[in-house]
Amino acid sequence: MEQQVKDDIQRVFQLQKKQQKALRASTAEQRREKLQRFLDSVIAHEEEIIEAIRKDVRKPYHEVKKAEIEGTKKAIRDNMNNLEQWMAPKEVGSSLSPDANGILMYEPKGVTLILGPWNYPFMLTMAPLAASLAAGNSAIVKLSDFTMNTSNIAAKVIRDAFDEKEVAIFEGEVEVATELLDQPFDHIFFTGSTNVGKIVMTAAAKHLASVTLELGGKSPTIIDSEYDLMDAAKKIAVGKFVNAGQTCIAPDYLFIKKDVQDKFAGILQTVVNAGFMEDDHTPDRSKFTQIVNDRDKPLALYVFSKNQDLIDNVLQHTTSGNAAINDVVVHFSDVNLPFGGVNTSGIGSYHGVYGFKEFSHEKGVFIQASK
């Protein structure tokens, strides 16, 4: 890596560090204006973004449009529309005295680093950026070196919208990421593999920086004997094959009764061969919960069932970052729910208010009544 790049990284980091006092005092209106610039830039470069992603990973146009473009715009708008509510101090009362009160205040963490993956290279980098900006931070961004066309257009989007003291982007290979990780960031947000996540966490530990790690894992799917096998097959096929199978929460392995597994396999094959999705008892509960629990904790777990006792049993006796009932993958898009893993599948969560809180320091303030 050229010395000039190292110098630029250190220069921009220090430039953003000097901005923290002003950012801490930023109003909802100022943050919304910044997010509006971001949204306008994404819209202005929409077709270029789509073309770049298609060059990098060969995604179909409609998949890029829906997941990468609309997903990013939705994330930005959600932050814009809820800023006042999220930023407002929250009264929680006091356990010490009826004359006292407690409030929660949300402060920006400071200078944040966002490292994106290659499978959804634009949205999974820009959605966290929107949350960081909503929380009042500055950010330095780096996309995956496997998606250089997308990185190039992302740089254009960011530089058209922001001064580098607000948001900066660096391009390049692993040496650039390594140099970035040497800087004393206040928070690091990483999406990628568990192995690289460990490297990121090790680097963060040197500066006691907080982290959000959006990792992966093998997501189990349980199909109850009473559930419509055709419906399950359609949803599983979509969830597994969308994005050429490269989705961190795609269903990975199934639990189904042996006497219906061949029938289900035939239905699933028919659905897949059709191009998109066309068509008695479940395994012993203790067996599939044991198998799930013997593995690393997954990022997602799925249950197809109308039996509430079965659903409750699975949810109570397994651990996963998230879970969905009678569907797969779609929970990622629900901003009312936190999205994140647990242990090897991740640390921390985001989306909606949860992303705002992830990029904020939640400060408790005790207030004693004056005499």
Predicted regions: what is each one?
Residues 162, 195-287, 325:
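ALDH superfamily catalytic-core signature
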Residues 18-24, 114, 222-223, 253-256, ...:
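Short, well-ordered beta-strand elements within core beta-sheets of diverse protein domains
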Residues 92-231:
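Rossmann-like NAD(P) dinucleotide-binding subdomain of oxidoreductase/dehydrogenase enzymes
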Residues 31, 76, 136, 167, ...:
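Residue-level signal for inorganic ion chemistry
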